[in-house]
């Protein structure tokens, strides 16, 4: 437990950031699921539309450090690879 006033404030701020970041990561997972669902449905056009919507969201969350930039790149790369395989 934080003993000083400053430590108590830092604990509050850390908890607020944790909750906000959890919400942001959840949003990213939702966008990823939409793309995967479109891929599994076999609809290339829908998959591309969902992917184009997901890309800026993933990048924005990575810029805010809720997820790492490398993880964001890995996610986008894997989704794009699956979409290309669907088109072939």
Swiss-Prot record:
GO biological process: translation
Any GO molecular function: small ribosomal subunit rRNA binding
Entries under Gene3D superfamilies matching the protein: Ribosomal protein S20
GO cellular component terms listed in the entry, alphabetical order: cytosol; small ribosomal subunit
Listed InterPro entries: Ribosomal_bS20, Ribosomal_bS20_sf
Positions of region (Disordered): 1-27
Keyword flag Ribosomal protein: yes
Keywords from the UniProt entry: Ribonucleoprotein, Ribosomal protein, RNA-binding, rRNA-binding
Any Pfam family: Ribosomal_S20p
Keyword S-adenosyl-L-methionine: no
Family (UniProt): Belongs to the bacterial ribosomal protein bS20 family.
Role noted for this protein: Binds directly to 16S ribosomal RNA.
Matches recorded under HAMAP family: Ribosomal_bS20 (MF_00500)
Protein name as it appears in the record: Small ribosomal subunit protein bS20
Organism: Chromohalobacter salexigens (strain ATCC BAA-138 / DSM 3043 / CIP 106854 / NCIMB 13768 / 1H11)
Gene label: rpsT
